[in-house]
């Protein structure tokens, strides 16, 4: 039987070689080279995190909160470099979430890891 850590490293290497990761890495490098774009992305992510923390703490997330974040996204994503960064980041995050779900389901931990309750 193969060592699970060796397989994890193989998966990590496969991810690094994927088109999705390469796209994300290139977009990230562009953002990091431009201080103004970097600050815009950081401000957006900060507001996004604040909204998520509010939700996780059981505080009400108002439609105004959501609208404000959506408006900010629409404004900053007018910049093609930011739009590319955010969309490539979202695609990479989806792949990582899918991989986590596949692993959790394979070892029967889906409910524990994702908080899903099945009615039996």
From Swiss-Prot:
InterPro entries: Com_YlbF (IPR010368), YheA/YmcA-like_dom_sf (IPR023378)
Family in the record: Belongs to the UPF0342 family.
Cysteines joined through disulfide linkages: none
Gene3D superfamilies for the chain: YheA/YmcA-like (1.20.1500.10)
Signal peptide start and end residues: none
Superkingdom field: Bacteria
Protein name per its UniProtKB record: UPF0342 protein Csac_0863
Pfam families, per database record: Com_YlbF (PF06133)
Lineage: Bacteria, Bacillati, Bacillota, Bacillota incertae sedis, Caldicellulosiruptorales
């Amino acid at each position: 039987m193969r060592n699970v850590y060796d397989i994890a490293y193989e998966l990590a290497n496969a991810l690094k070689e994927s088109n999705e990761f390469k796209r994300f890495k290139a977009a990230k490098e562009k953002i990091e080279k431009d201080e103004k774009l970097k600050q815009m992305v950081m401000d957006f992510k900060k507001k996004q995190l604040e909204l998520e923390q509010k939700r996780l703490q059981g505080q009400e997330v108002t439609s105004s909160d959501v609208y404000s974040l959506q408006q900010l996204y629409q404004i900053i994503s007018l910049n093609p470099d930011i739009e590319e960064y955010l969309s490539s980041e979202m695609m990479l995050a989806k792949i990582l979430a899918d991989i986590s779900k596949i692993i959790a389901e394979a070892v029967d931990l889906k409910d524990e890891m994702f908080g899903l309750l099945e009615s039996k």
